[in-house]
Amino acid sequence: MSERPNILWYCTDQQRFDTIGALGNPHVRTPVVDQLVRDGVAFTHTYCQSPICTPSRASFMSGLYPSRVHNTRNGNATFPNWPPVISKLMADAGYDCGLIGKFHLQSSGRRTEPRIDDGFSYWKFSHAPRDDWEEGHDYADWVREQGGDLNALRESDDRVPTELHQTTWASERSIEFIRQPHAGPWMLNVNIYDPHPPFIPPRSYAEQFDPAAMPGPHFRESDMAAQAKLADCDFQDEVRTPEEHDAHAVQARYYAMIAQIDDQFARILQTLDETGQRDNTVIVFTSDHGEALGDHGLMYKGCRFYEGLVRIPLIISWPGRFVADHQSDALVELLDLSATLLDLADVEMPDYFQGASLRSILEGRDLSDAHRNFVRSEYFDALDPHFTGGSGTYATMHRTRTHKLCVYHGKGVGELFDLENDPWEHENLWDDPAHADLKHRL
Protein backbone atom coordinates (compact mmCIF):
# COMPACT_ATOMS: atom_id res chain seq x y z
CA MET A 1 0.00 0.00 0.00
CA SER A 2 1.67 3.21 -1.19
CA GLU A 3 -0.37 5.55 1.01
CA ARG A 4 -0.90 4.93 4.70
CA PRO A 5 -4.36 6.05 5.78
CA ASN A 6 -5.43 8.09 8.75
CA ILE A 7 -7.58 6.10 11.18
CA LEU A 8 -10.63 7.40 13.03
CA TRP A 9 -11.52 4.77 15.63
CA TYR A 10 -14.79 5.64 17.37
CA CYS A 11 -15.69 3.33 20.25
CA THR A 12 -18.87 3.65 22.27
CA ASP A 13 -19.35 1.95 25.65
CA GLN A 14 -21.84 -0.86 26.22
CA GLN A 15 -23.64 -0.66 22.86
CA ARG A 16 -25.40 -3.79 21.60
CA PHE A 17 -25.15 -5.06 18.05
CA ASP A 18 -28.88 -4.57 17.34
CA THR A 19 -28.95 -0.79 17.71
CA ILE A 20 -28.32 0.34 14.12
CA GLY A 21 -31.21 1.31 11.86
CA ALA A 22 -29.59 0.11 8.63
CA LEU A 23 -28.94 -3.27 10.24
CA GLY A 24 -32.57 -3.93 11.04
CA ASN A 25 -33.73 -1.88 14.04
CA PRO A 26 -36.66 0.40 13.07
CA HIS A 27 -36.91 1.95 16.54
CA VAL A 28 -33.51 3.67 16.74
CA ARG A 29 -32.45 6.86 14.94
CA THR A 30 -28.97 6.43 13.46
CA PRO A 31 -28.90 8.08 10.00
CA VAL A 32 -25.17 8.85 10.10
CA VAL A 33 -24.09 5.36 11.15
CA ASP A 34 -26.63 4.01 8.65
CA GLN A 35 -24.79 5.89 5.91
CA LEU A 36 -21.50 4.47 7.18
CA VAL A 37 -23.00 0.99 6.73
CA ARG A 38 -23.86 1.88 3.13
CA ASP A 39 -20.39 3.34 2.56
CA GLY A 40 -18.45 0.41 4.00
CA VAL A 41 -18.55 -3.05 5.53
CA ALA A 42 -20.69 -3.98 8.53
CA PHE A 43 -19.48 -7.09 10.35
CA THR A 44 -22.77 -8.34 11.73
CA HIS A 45 -21.35 -11.15 13.90
CA THR A 46 -18.60 -9.41 15.87
CA TYR A 47 -17.98 -10.60 19.43
CA CYS A 48 -16.06 -8.96 22.25
CA GLN A 49 -13.57 -11.04 24.22
CA SER A 50 -15.16 -10.15 27.54
CA PRO A 51 -18.56 -8.66 28.43
CA ILE A 52 -16.76 -6.33 30.89
CA CYS A 53 -14.97 -3.05 30.07
CA THR A 54 -11.35 -3.45 31.14
CA PRO A 55 -10.68 -7.01 29.91
CA SER A 56 -12.40 -6.25 26.61
CA ARG A 57 -10.37 -3.08 26.10
CA ALA A 58 -7.15 -4.78 27.17
CA SER A 59 -7.86 -7.42 24.53
CA PHE A 60 -8.55 -5.18 21.55
CA MET A 61 -5.72 -2.81 22.47
CA SER A 62 -3.20 -5.67 22.72
CA GLY A 63 -4.40 -8.18 20.11
CA LEU A 64 -4.60 -10.91 22.78
CA TYR A 65 -7.34 -12.59 24.77
CA PRO A 66 -7.76 -11.04 28.25
CA SER A 67 -6.43 -14.19 29.92
CA ARG A 68 -3.31 -14.05 27.74
CA VAL A 69 -2.58 -10.41 28.53
CA HIS A 70 -3.29 -11.10 32.25
CA ASN A 71 -5.72 -8.20 32.49
CA THR A 72 -9.02 -9.90 33.20
CA ARG A 73 -10.99 -7.64 35.53
CA ASN A 74 -12.20 -4.12 36.22
CA GLY A 75 -10.40 -2.43 39.09
CA ASN A 76 -6.82 -3.45 38.23
CA ALA A 77 -4.24 -1.23 39.91
CA THR A 78 -1.74 -1.63 37.06
CA PHE A 79 -1.41 -2.75 33.45
CA PRO A 80 1.30 -5.27 32.49
CA ASN A 81 4.54 -3.97 30.97
CA TRP A 82 3.97 -6.43 28.11
CA PRO A 83 2.50 -6.50 25.52
CA PRO A 84 2.65 -3.03 23.99
CA VAL A 85 -0.74 -1.59 23.09
CA ILE A 86 -1.59 -0.99 19.44
CA SER A 87 -1.28 2.80 19.76
CA LYS A 88 2.34 2.36 20.85
CA LEU A 89 3.04 0.12 17.86
CA MET A 90 1.43 2.66 15.55
CA ALA A 91 3.31 5.59 17.09
CA ASP A 92 6.62 3.76 16.75
CA ALA A 93 5.78 3.30 13.05
CA GLY A 94 5.27 7.03 12.52
CA TYR A 95 1.61 7.59 13.33
CA ASP A 96 0.51 10.61 15.37
CA CYS A 97 -1.87 9.03 17.89
CA GLY A 98 -4.60 10.71 19.92
CA LEU A 99 -6.84 9.47 22.75
CA ILE A 100 -10.11 11.12 23.69
CA GLY A 101 -12.27 9.81 26.53
CA LYS A 102 -11.72 6.66 28.53
CA PHE A 103 -8.81 4.25 28.26
CA HIS A 104 -9.74 1.92 31.14
CA LEU A 105 -6.89 -0.54 31.05
CA GLN A 106 -6.47 0.19 34.76
CA SER A 107 -8.77 1.32 37.54
CA SER A 108 -9.93 4.93 37.56
CA GLY A 109 -11.68 4.59 40.91
CA ARG A 110 -10.84 7.65 43.03
CA ARG A 111 -7.84 8.44 40.82
CA THR A 112 -6.99 9.53 37.30
CA GLU A 113 -5.90 6.49 35.33
CA PRO A 114 -2.07 6.44 35.23
CA ARG A 115 -0.46 6.75 31.82
CA ILE A 116 1.44 3.80 30.42
CA ASP A 117 3.81 3.77 27.45
CA ASP A 118 0.79 4.17 25.19
CA GLY A 119 2.15 6.16 22.23
CA PHE A 120 -0.47 8.92 22.44
CA SER A 121 0.84 12.41 21.76
CA TYR A 122 -2.64 13.90 22.23
CA TRP A 123 -4.33 12.80 25.46
CA LYS A 124 -7.72 14.16 26.57
CA PHE A 125 -8.87 11.91 29.37
CA SER A 126 -12.40 11.38 30.67
CA HIS A 127 -13.12 8.03 32.24
CA ALA A 128 -16.76 8.86 32.97
CA PRO A 129 -19.02 11.94 32.88
CA ARG A 130 -18.76 12.55 36.63
CA ASP A 131 -16.74 15.15 38.49
CA ASP A 132 -14.93 12.57 40.62
CA TRP A 133 -11.34 13.49 39.79
CA GLU A 134 -9.58 16.55 41.20
CA GLU A 135 -7.14 16.81 38.31
CA GLY A 136 -6.52 15.31 34.90
CA HIS A 137 -10.20 15.09 33.90
CA ASP A 138 -10.35 17.15 30.72
CA TYR A 139 -14.11 16.85 30.27
CA ALA A 140 -14.96 18.14 33.77
CA ASP A 141 -12.51 21.00 33.30
CA TRP A 142 -14.22 21.83 29.98
CA VAL A 143 -17.65 21.92 31.67
CA ARG A 144 -16.36 24.18 34.45
CA GLU A 145 -14.80 26.54 31.91
CA GLN A 146 -18.32 27.05 30.53
CA GLY A 147 -19.80 27.69 33.97
CA GLY A 148 -21.37 24.27 34.44
CA ASP A 149 -21.51 22.08 37.56
CA LEU A 150 -21.34 18.55 36.20
CA ASN A 151 -22.61 16.66 39.23
CA ALA A 152 -25.49 19.11 39.73
CA LEU A 153 -26.45 18.82 36.07
CA ARG A 154 -26.50 15.03 36.28
CA GLU A 155 -29.07 15.23 39.08
CA SER A 156 -31.25 17.88 37.42
CA ASP A 157 -34.56 17.12 35.71
CA ASP A 158 -33.11 18.02 32.31
CA ARG A 159 -29.88 16.08 32.93
CA VAL A 160 -26.66 17.25 31.27
CA PRO A 161 -27.68 19.30 28.20
CA THR A 162 -26.27 18.43 24.80
CA GLU A 163 -23.99 21.46 24.68
CA LEU A 164 -22.23 20.31 27.89
CA HIS A 165 -22.46 16.55 27.36
CA GLN A 166 -19.41 14.28 27.35
CA THR A 167 -20.33 13.00 23.89
CA THR A 168 -20.28 16.61 22.64
CA TRP A 169 -16.97 17.28 24.39
CA ALA A 170 -15.50 14.23 22.64
CA SER A 171 -16.57 15.64 19.27
CA GLU A 172 -15.09 19.05 20.13
CA ARG A 173 -11.74 17.47 21.01
CA SER A 174 -11.88 15.23 17.92
CA ILE A 175 -12.42 18.24 15.69
CA GLU A 176 -9.49 19.96 17.37
CA PHE A 177 -7.23 16.97 16.73
CA ILE A 178 -8.30 16.50 13.11
CA ARG A 179 -7.79 20.18 12.28
CA GLN A 180 -4.33 20.46 13.82
CA PRO A 181 -1.28 19.94 11.57
CA HIS A 182 0.17 16.42 11.38
CA ALA A 183 3.55 15.55 9.93
CA GLY A 184 2.31 12.14 8.79
CA PRO A 185 -0.69 9.83 9.14
CA TRP A 186 -2.69 9.92 12.34
CA MET A 187 -4.85 7.58 14.42
CA LEU A 188 -7.52 9.03 16.68
CA ASN A 189 -9.09 6.71 19.27
CA VAL A 190 -12.34 8.27 20.54
CA ASN A 191 -13.88 6.47 23.52
CA ILE A 192 -17.15 7.97 24.73
CA TYR A 193 -19.02 6.78 27.83
CA ASP A 194 -22.53 6.46 26.37
CA PRO A 195 -24.75 4.46 26.08
CA HIS A 196 -23.37 3.08 29.36
CA PRO A 197 -25.62 3.23 32.47
CA PRO A 198 -27.05 5.14 34.30
CA PHE A 199 -29.03 5.84 31.10
CA ILE A 200 -29.52 9.59 31.56
CA PRO A 201 -29.70 11.24 28.13
CA PRO A 202 -30.43 14.96 27.80
CA ARG A 203 -34.13 15.62 28.12
CA SER A 204 -34.23 16.93 24.54
CA TYR A 205 -33.24 13.45 23.32
CA ALA A 206 -35.25 11.48 25.88
CA GLU A 207 -38.43 13.19 24.69
CA GLN A 208 -37.89 11.81 21.17
CA PHE A 209 -38.40 8.18 22.26
CA ASP A 210 -41.72 6.99 23.68
CA PRO A 211 -41.35 4.01 26.03
CA ALA A 212 -44.73 2.71 24.86
CA ALA A 213 -43.38 2.47 21.30
CA MET A 214 -40.36 0.41 22.29
CA PRO A 215 -40.28 -3.32 21.43
CA GLY A 216 -39.01 -4.32 24.87
CA PRO A 217 -36.52 -7.02 25.83
CA HIS A 218 -36.20 -10.62 24.68
CA PHE A 219 -37.84 -12.30 27.66
CA ARG A 220 -39.86 -15.39 28.51
CA GLU A 221 -41.25 -16.33 31.90
CA SER A 222 -39.01 -19.40 31.82
CA ASP A 223 -36.00 -17.06 31.93
CA MET A 224 -36.62 -16.44 35.64
CA ALA A 225 -36.04 -20.10 36.51
CA ALA A 226 -33.12 -20.31 34.09
CA GLN A 227 -31.40 -17.37 35.77
CA ALA A 228 -32.07 -18.80 39.22
CA LYS A 229 -29.80 -21.71 38.27
CA LEU A 230 -27.05 -19.17 37.52
CA ALA A 231 -27.55 -17.16 40.70
CA ASP A 232 -24.01 -17.88 41.91
CA CYS A 233 -22.52 -16.37 38.74
CA ASP A 234 -21.70 -12.66 38.93
CA PHE A 235 -24.06 -10.02 37.61
CA GLN A 236 -24.53 -6.33 38.38
CA ASP A 237 -28.27 -6.40 38.99
CA GLU A 238 -30.99 -8.69 40.24
CA VAL A 239 -33.10 -10.82 37.92
CA ARG A 240 -36.45 -9.13 37.36
CA THR A 241 -39.35 -9.16 34.93
CA PRO A 242 -39.47 -6.45 32.24
CA GLU A 243 -42.15 -4.66 34.27
CA GLU A 244 -40.00 -4.67 37.39
CA HIS A 245 -37.06 -3.34 35.39
CA ASP A 246 -39.29 -0.76 33.65
CA ALA A 247 -37.47 -2.13 30.64
CA HIS A 248 -39.38 -0.23 27.96
CA ALA A 249 -38.48 3.09 29.58
CA VAL A 250 -34.85 2.02 29.93
CA GLN A 251 -34.77 1.00 26.28
CA ALA A 252 -36.17 4.39 25.25
CA ARG A 253 -33.45 6.21 27.18
CA TYR A 254 -30.80 3.88 25.77
CA TYR A 255 -31.94 4.62 22.22
CA ALA A 256 -32.00 8.34 23.04
CA MET A 257 -28.34 8.17 24.03
CA ILE A 258 -27.52 6.39 20.77
CA ALA A 259 -29.35 9.10 18.80
CA GLN A 260 -27.16 11.75 20.42
CA ILE A 261 -24.07 9.69 19.61
CA ASP A 262 -25.12 9.61 15.97
CA ASP A 263 -25.54 13.39 15.85
CA GLN A 264 -22.14 14.01 17.43
CA PHE A 265 -20.41 11.40 15.28
CA ALA A 266 -21.75 13.35 12.29
CA ARG A 267 -19.81 16.45 13.37
CA ILE A 268 -16.53 14.51 13.30
CA LEU A 269 -17.21 13.09 9.84
CA GLN A 270 -18.15 16.56 8.61
CA THR A 271 -14.77 17.84 9.80
CA LEU A 272 -13.04 15.13 7.79
CA ASP A 273 -14.94 16.36 4.74
CA GLU A 274 -14.19 20.02 5.43
CA THR A 275 -10.47 19.36 5.82
CA GLY A 276 -10.25 17.16 2.74
CA GLN A 277 -9.21 14.09 4.74
CA ARG A 278 -12.23 11.82 4.30
CA ASP A 279 -10.83 9.98 1.27
CA ASN A 280 -7.65 9.01 3.13
CA THR A 281 -9.22 8.07 6.45
CA VAL A 282 -10.31 4.62 7.56
CA ILE A 283 -13.39 5.07 9.74
CA VAL A 284 -14.22 2.50 12.42
CA PHE A 285 -17.40 2.50 14.51
CA THR A 286 -17.62 -0.10 17.27
CA SER A 287 -18.16 -0.68 21.00
CA ASP A 288 -16.35 -2.49 23.81
CA HIS A 289 -19.23 -4.85 24.77
CA GLY A 290 -23.01 -4.97 24.89
CA GLU A 291 -25.82 -4.46 27.40
CA ALA A 292 -28.44 -6.90 28.69
CA LEU A 293 -31.22 -4.26 28.49
CA GLY A 294 -33.78 -6.52 30.16
CA ASP A 295 -33.12 -9.64 28.06
CA HIS A 296 -33.55 -12.82 30.14
CA GLY A 297 -34.57 -10.67 33.12
CA LEU A 298 -31.13 -9.02 33.29
CA MET A 299 -30.02 -5.40 33.21
CA TYR A 300 -26.48 -4.03 32.77
CA LYS A 301 -23.65 -6.59 32.48
CA GLY A 302 -21.85 -9.44 34.20
CA CYS A 303 -20.98 -13.09 33.76
CA ARG A 304 -23.34 -14.02 30.93
CA PHE A 305 -22.71 -14.42 27.22
CA TYR A 306 -26.08 -13.75 25.62
CA GLU A 307 -26.03 -12.07 22.21
CA GLY A 308 -26.99 -8.66 23.60
CA LEU A 309 -23.99 -8.72 25.93
CA VAL A 310 -21.18 -10.01 23.72
CA ARG A 311 -22.21 -9.16 20.15
CA ILE A 312 -21.39 -5.61 19.13
CA PRO A 313 -21.43 -3.29 16.11
CA LEU A 314 -18.34 -3.15 13.91
CA ILE A 315 -18.50 -0.98 10.80
CA ILE A 316 -15.42 -0.04 8.77
CA SER A 317 -15.29 2.33 5.81
CA TRP A 318 -12.62 3.75 3.50
CA PRO A 319 -14.15 5.46 0.46
CA GLY A 320 -12.86 4.10 -2.82
CA ARG A 321 -10.62 1.50 -1.16
CA PHE A 322 -13.06 -0.85 0.58
CA VAL A 323 -16.18 -2.48 -0.77
CA ALA A 324 -19.32 -0.52 -0.01
CA ASP A 325 -22.73 -1.52 1.30
CA HIS A 326 -21.59 -5.01 2.29
CA GLN A 327 -22.84 -6.84 5.36
CA SER A 328 -20.47 -9.65 6.28
CA ASP A 329 -21.82 -12.49 8.42
CA ALA A 330 -18.32 -13.82 9.11
CA LEU A 331 -17.60 -14.67 12.73
CA VAL A 332 -15.30 -11.90 13.96
CA GLU A 333 -13.57 -11.25 17.27
CA LEU A 334 -13.08 -7.66 18.40
CA LEU A 335 -9.35 -8.30 18.80
CA ASP A 336 -9.29 -8.82 15.01
CA LEU A 337 -9.64 -5.04 14.76
CA SER A 338 -6.14 -4.36 16.10
CA ALA A 339 -4.68 -6.82 13.59
CA THR A 340 -6.67 -5.15 10.82
CA LEU A 341 -5.48 -1.64 11.69
CA LEU A 342 -1.83 -2.71 11.80
CA ASP A 343 -2.28 -4.41 8.43
CA LEU A 344 -3.86 -1.32 6.85
CA ALA A 345 -1.10 0.89 8.27
CA ASP A 346 1.64 -1.40 6.94
CA VAL A 347 2.88 -1.96 10.48
CA GLU A 348 4.43 -5.36 11.11
CA MET A 349 2.11 -7.53 13.16
CA PRO A 350 3.73 -9.13 16.22
CA ASP A 351 3.92 -12.90 15.94
CA TYR A 352 2.13 -13.31 19.27
CA PHE A 353 -1.05 -11.59 18.02
CA GLN A 354 -4.20 -13.70 18.33
CA GLY A 355 -6.25 -11.43 16.08
CA ALA A 356 -6.67 -12.01 12.34
CA SER A 357 -6.84 -9.15 9.84
CA LEU A 358 -10.12 -8.41 8.08
CA ARG A 359 -8.41 -6.65 5.19
CA SER A 360 -9.22 -9.26 2.54
CA ILE A 361 -12.93 -8.91 3.33
CA LEU A 362 -12.76 -5.11 3.39
CA GLU A 363 -11.05 -5.00 0.01
CA GLY A 364 -13.50 -7.50 -1.50
CA ARG A 365 -10.89 -10.17 -2.18
CA ASP A 366 -12.68 -12.70 0.04
CA LEU A 367 -16.35 -12.12 0.71
CA SER A 368 -16.97 -15.58 2.12
CA ASP A 369 -17.94 -16.04 5.76
CA ALA A 370 -14.95 -18.29 6.48
CA HIS A 371 -12.92 -15.83 8.56
CA ARG A 372 -13.21 -17.86 11.81
CA ASN A 373 -14.77 -21.19 12.74
CA PHE A 374 -15.65 -19.95 16.23
CA VAL A 375 -15.36 -16.95 18.54
CA ARG A 376 -14.41 -16.90 22.21
CA SER A 377 -15.33 -14.68 25.14
CA GLU A 378 -14.13 -14.87 28.74
CA TYR A 379 -15.16 -13.85 32.24
CA PHE A 380 -12.44 -14.34 34.84
CA ASP A 381 -13.66 -12.76 38.10
CA ALA A 382 -14.04 -9.64 35.97
CA LEU A 383 -16.46 -7.36 37.81
CA ASP A 384 -15.04 -4.93 40.33
CA PRO A 385 -15.35 -6.42 43.86
CA HIS A 386 -17.58 -3.43 44.68
CA PHE A 387 -20.34 -5.29 42.81
CA THR A 388 -19.54 -8.90 43.63
CA GLY A 389 -17.46 -9.05 46.78
CA GLY A 390 -14.90 -11.00 44.76
CA SER A 391 -16.94 -14.16 44.25
CA GLY A 392 -14.39 -15.93 42.07
CA THR A 393 -16.62 -16.61 39.06
CA TYR A 394 -14.87 -17.93 35.94
CA ALA A 395 -16.58 -18.72 32.65
CA THR A 396 -15.87 -19.05 28.94
CA MET A 397 -18.02 -18.91 25.80
CA HIS A 398 -17.40 -20.87 22.60
CA ARG A 399 -19.67 -19.77 19.75
CA THR A 400 -19.71 -21.48 16.37
CA ARG A 401 -21.86 -20.58 13.37
CA THR A 402 -24.74 -22.67 14.73
CA HIS A 403 -24.28 -23.17 18.48
CA LYS A 404 -23.10 -21.43 21.63
CA LEU A 405 -21.57 -23.18 24.65
CA CYS A 406 -21.11 -21.30 27.94
CA VAL A 407 -19.22 -23.04 30.74
CA TYR A 408 -19.37 -21.61 34.26
CA HIS A 409 -16.30 -23.29 35.67
CA GLY A 410 -16.64 -24.92 39.06
CA LYS A 411 -20.32 -24.03 39.33
CA GLY A 412 -21.76 -27.26 37.95
CA VAL A 413 -23.90 -25.33 35.46
CA GLY A 414 -23.67 -24.26 31.85
CA GLU A 415 -25.61 -23.26 28.77
CA LEU A 416 -25.88 -24.71 25.27
CA PHE A 417 -27.99 -22.99 22.64
CA ASP A 418 -29.00 -23.94 19.11
CA LEU A 419 -28.72 -20.48 17.54
CA GLU A 420 -30.33 -21.48 14.26
CA ASN A 421 -33.58 -22.45 15.97
CA ASP A 422 -33.29 -20.35 19.13
CA PRO A 423 -31.46 -17.12 18.20
CA TRP A 424 -32.38 -15.31 21.43
CA GLU A 425 -31.23 -18.19 23.64
CA HIS A 426 -34.25 -19.20 25.67
CA GLU A 427 -33.95 -23.02 25.38
CA ASN A 428 -30.91 -24.26 27.31
CA LEU A 429 -29.85 -27.68 25.98
CA TRP A 430 -27.03 -28.17 28.51
CA ASP A 431 -28.80 -30.99 30.38
CA ASP A 432 -30.51 -32.49 27.31
CA PRO A 433 -29.18 -36.07 26.80
CA ALA A 434 -29.82 -35.75 23.06
CA HIS A 435 -27.22 -32.97 22.91
CA ALA A 436 -24.61 -34.49 25.25
CA ASP A 437 -22.28 -35.47 22.41
CA LEU A 438 -22.45 -32.00 20.85
CA LYS A 439 -21.78 -30.39 24.23
CA HIS A 440 -18.66 -32.45 24.78
CA ARG A 441 -17.39 -31.83 21.25
CA LEU A 442 -17.78 -28.09 21.67
Residue ranges and their predicted role:
Residues E420:
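Residues forming the ATP-binding cleft of Hanks-type serine/threonine protein kinase domains
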Residues M1-Y408, V413-G414, P423-R441:
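Formylglycine-dependent sulfatase
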